Amino acid sequence: AMPYAQIHYPFENKEIFDDRKVYPADFIAEGVDQTRGWFFTLHAIATMVFDSVSYKAVVSNGLVLDKNGNKMSKRLGNAVDPFATIEQYGSDPLRWYMITNASPWDNIKFDIDGIEEVRRKFFGTLYNTYSFFALYANVDGFDYSEPDVDWKERPEIDRWILSLLNSLVKDVDGFLDTYEPTRA
């Protein structure tokens, strides 16, 4: 069990564990079905053996259901092969689809057609934006190694865009720090 087995404690790496470099864990993540089993067992072991908690925070993932809201099952024939899905659509569109369609703690209705839509609408737009930039950057001989222009010397539109970017970074960091990746 994490974090004991992952570092082969107590047979090896005792100093890493005893120095609290890997223990307690900052957070753990697992399905909601593990609440009474794994989550409880980790704390019970930690309390009995080390008089401590084994993790500081927990993210309990919801279930991945089929597009009709039924539990996925090989027996029912509605399970999706994750490796084939990644091979066909790529891992980034799959990740983006999963993180933007439901909060991690909510159940998600998985529809493979949604990954294609994400790939086309989000990643296609991102790719086209980059292609547009790259085309004109190459034509104009753009070189990012040019020195940065001081904030006060930039045009107002540049300062406005940079202000929006800095606000976005602050918001995203805040959402990630509070375990709200869907809002990030």
Question: What residue ranges belong to the model's regions?
Answer:
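Structured secondary-structure scaffolds
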Residues: A1-V139, Y144-P147, R154, D158-A184
